[in-house]
Amino acid sequence: MAEKVYQVRNIYKCIHEKAGEKKTFTVRVPGSKSITNRALLLSMLSDGDCVLKGALFSDDSRYLVQCIADLGFAITADEAAEEIRVRGLSGRIPQKEASVYVGSAGTAARFLTALLGLKEGVWHLDASEQMRRRPMEPLLACLKTLGTQVIYEGEEGHFPFTLIAKAEETAEEAGRENRRTVTVDIAHSSQFLSALLIASCCSGRNLDIRVQGTHGMAYIDMTVKMMEQFGIVPQRLEGVSEKAGDAGAGGFRMGQGCYRHQVYEIEPDVSAACYFYAMAALLGIEGRVQGVHYDSLQGDVEFLRILERMGCETKETPEGIVLHGPEKGKLMGVEADMHACSDQAITLAAIAPYADSPVTITGIGHIRYQESDRLAAIAQELTRIGIRVQTREDGLTIYPGQPCPGKIHTYDDHRMAMGFSLTGLRAEGIEIDDPGCCRKTFAQYFEVLD
């Protein structure tokens, strides 16, 4: 977006002054970032031509598309048609040495690091200043255990670095029960585990991947289900539940195989959809997001259950879930463990001041290590507009209050920009600094909001 500040319009009073008018909206959101990026990796490792339909085109996905091209793969993107074509080479990477730049894309950063670290070659990886601040050591430690040399070009455990990966085992060796074991700590990011899962079956190594922590298991579920859709079924070891968030000290047993090429439909982005469902809740109106259903691969659909506890009603329809906000947006306070849908912690925090009692969010300590220190950012910005907040190690409590005018700092974090835009729909004088940071996942967000 060209403007440096977005002025949010208080539309609450306007909506409820029009007595008798049906208050409803339907919106369409772009494809899921998480699914698009996983599908890109699975496609490049597949046994032939893949077509991804409904793909997201954002900063993150464009970085990953460029990285795949830089590795020598045939890949074409048609943004108008929302379609990406990738020619997989049955797990082979065309080049033996390459430099890739992942920008601020966390999935590209973690997934490509795991893949390249398990494939013979010399790989130079770099990232944006924002991504350079985010941790990589838990994943790099696993690669080092498997014999990959890591040469840091800056701070240890962070981008940039060079991976020197040794040749994978021969087919004969891979067939033996000389299984290797690595343990990955997912306290800061479940992407470390997802990355190893996707890459391991094409690595020439039989791996047992042990897991420390339970953060982000909804995203692990997504990864496993998508691997299954592409023809590889990870074997769960004792301690890993089928239910998101129930994983213990278990893991996954991975053998060798090849992903199947296919035409793959990308789901709408439920993370993006949640802003519009929260808007319907906040304004006390009816909202539908096309193509969003409760059987989604995406864990953020659980956010709608939290909105139900705050007084909303939801209904499945063939076109998508419809949410009815409570009369005049009279939300109830709630205590919510959001470990399975932590990307929506900012969304809930942004509408929490309008609840009739405190809103307590738990299970989100890991969001301190994302695009920004999101826990600190939430507290800082709510305090800036006059809302009382109490923080703790794994969450925070937000107390009811009417927000004052103020400019919301976004910290180059797309979710801060989109989430806090909701606060201004029932308050005067709320501005969003740097709305253009939404390019990371949803460049047209403020146009759709308008």
PLM region descriptions:
Residues 1-450:
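Structural preference for solvent-exposed beta-strand-turn elements
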